[in-house]
From Swiss-Prot:
Organism: Enterococcus faecalis (strain ATCC 700802 / V583)
Keyword Nucleotide-binding: yes
Pathway: Cofactor biosynthesis; coenzyme A biosynthesis; CoA from (R)-pantothenate: step 5/5
Protein's UniProt name: Dephospho-CoA kinase
Gene encoding the protein: coaE
Domain of life: Bacteria
Length: 199
């Protein structure tokens, strides 16, 4: 029986590091960010839905999405960001579910990488949810260093997601990423040994 493990975290908590460790161990990854980009490619139904919602000026002359223009629109307006999310939600969910079913045919464990897993209510389709955790103070420091942000800018980005402590409380598994990469890798290996029987 294939297990479906959803992996989430907060911005700059190290989710990508943990997902990469599962990938290295040979497990298929269903990547929510990649799917979100693919579903709005030229000619896709989700792009047509965006045009219907935001108008034809959101598309370049090539027929592709003008990501810069869309980014400016949704960054300036939380209402427009919410509208975009609502527009894309059914297309995204359908493709994520399709890819999970495909991956389940090939492996004993499928990893589903969704940054806003709890916010978008994907936990119901997972067997378990793992949260990659660091305290908010470290999260903010890492985000400021990684993206060259001021403290205020970093705080704004963190505040746009559920608090990491809240995600930690709801998680079935917590991968603590405060230490070294090696320490995090040991946690992943231990979980794989216990759950999948793979060393």
């Amino acid at each position: 029986m294939t297990k479906v493990l959803g992996i989430t975290g907060g911005i700059a908590t190290g989710k990508s590091t943990v997902v990469a460790l599962f990938k290295k161990a040979g497990y298929p990854i269903v990547d929510g960010d990649i799917i979100a980009r693919e579903i709005v490619a030229k000619g896709q139904p989700a792009l047509a839905a965006i045009v219907e919602t935001f108008g034809p000026e959101i598309v370049l002359t090539t027929g592709e999405l003008d990501r810069k223009k869309l980014g400016q629109l949704i960054f300036a307006s939380p209402q427009k960001r919410e509208l975009l999310n609502e527009t894309l939600k059914p297309f995204l969910r359908k493709e994520i579910l399709r890819q999970i079913e495909e991956a389940k045919k090939k492996a004993a464990l499928v990893i589903v990488d969704i940054p806003l897993l709890y916010e978008a209510h994907y936990e119901a389709i997972m067997d378990q949810v793992a949260v990659v955790y660091v305290p908010e103070k470290i999260q903010k420091e890492r985000l400021m260093a990684r993206n060259q942000l001021t403290e205020e800018e970093a705080q704004q980005r963190i505040a746009s997601q559920w608090p990491i402590e809240m995600k930690k409380e709801r998680a079935d598994i917590v991968f603590d990423n405060q230490g070294t990469r090696e320490e995090t890798e040991q946690q992943v290996k231990k979980w794989l040994e216990e759950q999948i029987g793979k060393k």
